[in-house]
C-alpha cells in the first residue's frame, strides 16, 4: 500500500436513456419504484431498520435507502463488502439527523421530495484505487443515486472522520444533483480558470490548494468539483477548521525539494512557520511546502529591520479572497433558487454535532477543542448519549414485532 492515500470524491455522470426531467411543484411525476405496498417481515432481525427507512425515507421522499449491498448496483471491478447492521443503523439515523432533517427545516416543503436522490446505496468497505493512490468516498449517478462507501468504519466519536467520509460526501454529491437542476453561475467557472488540473490534484497539499483559492485539493480538479466542494466544506467544517483553512489561504505557498534530514535541521522553534512542512510523495519524491517570504542567498529567512518575517505574494493571488468570492456565489445560488440560507444549514449542522452553551455559543474542552455532542448526554434523555438516543429511533420499532 502506498505511503499516502489521496482522497477522491468521484462524480459519475450517468446518461439516462429517457433523459432527466426536473420536477415542478405541481407535478412531481410518478415514482420510479414499484409503488405496491409490500408488508415488512416482522420475523426478520432487520425489521426495525427496514421500518425506519420506510417511514423516514421511502414514504416522505420516495427515497430507497439500500443497506443490503446489491452487486448489480455496485462497482463490479472492486472487492466490496456489505455494511454491518449496526453501522447501517448508525448511518441511517445520522443521515436523517444531519442531512434530511436540516434541509427539511430550512427548505421549502417540497425541496427534498423534488431534489433528493432516489436511491442511497450504502457499502461497508472502502473503494480503493491502489494504482492511483486514491479512494472513492462517494458516487452520484445521473441525479438519481448516491453510493456511500466505508460504512463499517463509521465512528460517531470522531466527527472529523465522520464528516470527511460521510457527511461532506453527502453534501458534495447532493450539491451535484442540485447543480443539475439549477446550473451554477457561469461566472464561477472563470474565477480559477486555467488553474484546474484533473491529473495532479492528488499530490496537492491542502495548504497549496488553499493558497490558490481552493477549499480542498479535489476542488482544484475541475470547476464542477470546486463548486460542490465549497458547499460541502463550508457546511461540514467546524468554525475552528474553517478559520484554519482561511488562515492558510491568506498566504502564498511554494514547493521546495528538500530531504528529510535537511528539513529536520531547519524546522526547529520559530523557524517552523517559515520552513514549512515535509512530505514524501507516493513516487518517493521528498518535498517541503512553505509560505513564500523574503530569503537571503543561503535560502534562509531575511527579516526586516524590526526582526519580522517579510511575507511575499509573487503571483498576486489571494486564496482567502477567492474562496470567499466562491462561497458568496454558492450562498446566492441556494438563496435565489431554493430560498435556502447556507449559513442556517451550517449553523444547524454544527449545533447538532457540537455542544453549545445556553446562549448558543460553542463549548470547548480544556484543550480548546469543540465537544462532540453525539457522545454527550442527550437533551431528550440525559441518561443516554445523543447517539444512543438517535439509535432508539430504529430500535423503538422492535415493539411492533
Residue ranges with predicted function:
Residues 96, 100, 104, 175-183, ...:
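Sec-exported extracytoplasmic/periplasmic mature domains
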Residues 28, 89-145:
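Auxiliary, metal-adjacent structural segments of Zn-dependent hydrolase domains
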Residues 119-122, 145-149, 179, 226-234:
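Structural recognition of the beta-strand scaffold that forms the well-ordered cores
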Residues 63-83, 307-311:
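Acidic/histidine-rich, surface-exposed loop or edge segments in extracytoplasmic proteins
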Residues 77-85, 134, 153-161, 165, ...:
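Second-shell loop/turn segments in exported
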Residues 160-185, 228:
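Active-site recognition of the HExxH zinc-binding catalytic motif
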Residues 196-340, 345, 352-401:
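Metalloprotease/metallohydrolase-associated module, dominated by Zn2+-dependent proteases
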Residues 1-5, 13-63, 387, 395, ...:
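Bacterial Sec-dependent N-terminal signal peptides
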Amino acid at each position: 500500500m502506498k505511503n499516502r492515500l489521496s482522497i477522491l470524491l468521484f462524480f459519475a455522470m450517468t446518461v439516462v436513456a429517457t433523459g432527466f426531467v426536473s420536477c415542478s411543484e405541481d407535478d412531481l411525476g410518478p415514482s420510479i419504484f414499484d409503488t405496491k405496498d409490500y408488508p415488512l417481515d416482522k420475523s426478520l432481525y432487520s425489521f426495525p431498520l427496514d421500518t425506519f427507512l420506510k417511514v423516514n425515507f421511502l414514504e416522505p421522499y420516495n427515497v430507497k435507502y439500500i443497506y443490503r449491498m446489491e452487486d448489480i448496483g455496485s462497482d463490479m471491478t472492486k472487492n466490496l463488502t456489505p455494511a454491518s447492521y449496526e453501522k447501517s443503523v448508525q448511518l441511517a439515523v445520522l443521515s436523517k439527523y444531519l442531512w434530511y432533517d436540516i434541509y427539511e427545516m430550512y427548505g421549502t416543503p417540497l425541496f427534498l421530495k423534488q431534489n433528493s436522490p432516489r436511491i442511497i446505496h450504502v457499502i461497508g468497505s472502502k473503494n480503493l484505487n491502489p494504482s492511483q493512490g486514491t479512494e472513492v468516498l462517494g458516487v452520484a449517478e445521473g441525479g438519481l443515486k448516491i453510493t456511500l462507501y466505508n460504512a463499517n468504519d463509521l465512528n460517531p466519536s470522531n466527527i472529523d472522520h465522520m464528516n470527511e467520509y460521510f457527511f461532506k460526501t453527502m453534501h458534495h454529491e447532493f450539491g451535484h444533483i442540485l447543480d443539475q437542476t439549477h446550473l451554477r453561475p457561469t461566472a464561477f467557472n472563470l474565477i480559477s480558470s486555467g488553474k484546474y488540473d484533473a491529473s495532479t490534484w492528488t499530490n496537492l497539499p491542502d495548504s497549496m490548494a488553499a493558497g490558490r483559492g481552493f477549499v480542498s485539493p479535489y476542488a482544484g480538479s475541475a470547476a464542477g468539483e470546486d463548486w460542490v466542494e465549497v458547499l460541502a466544506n463550508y457546511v461540514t467544517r467546524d468554525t475552528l477548521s474553517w478559520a484554519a483553512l482561511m488562515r492558510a489561504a491568506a498566504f502564498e505557498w511554494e514547493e521546495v525539494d528538500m530531504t528529510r534530514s535537511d528539513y529536520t535541521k531547519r524546522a526547529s522553534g520559530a523557524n517552523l512557520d517559515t520552513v514549512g512542512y515535509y512530505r514524501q510523495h507516493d513516487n518517493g519524491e521528498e518535498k517541503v511546502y512553505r509560505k513564500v517570504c523574503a530569503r537571503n542567498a543561503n535560502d534562509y529567512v531575511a527579516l526586516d529591520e524590526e526582526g519580522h518575517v517579510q511575507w511575499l505574494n509573487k503571483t498576486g493571488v489571494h486564496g482567502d479572497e477567492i474562496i470567499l468570492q466562491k462561497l458568496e456565489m454558492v450562498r446566492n445560488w441556494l438563496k435565489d433558487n431554493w430560498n435556502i440560507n447556507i449559513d442556517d444549514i451550517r449553523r444547524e449542522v454544527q449545533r447538532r454535532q457540537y455542544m453549545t452553551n445556553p446562549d448558543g455559543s460553542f463549548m470547548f474542552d480544556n484543550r480548546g477543542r469543540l465537544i462532540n455532542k453525539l457522545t454527550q448526554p442527550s437533551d431528550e434523555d440525559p441518561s443516554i448519549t445523543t447517539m444512543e438516543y438517535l439509535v432508539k429511533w430504529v430500535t423503538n420499532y422492535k415493539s411492533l414485532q
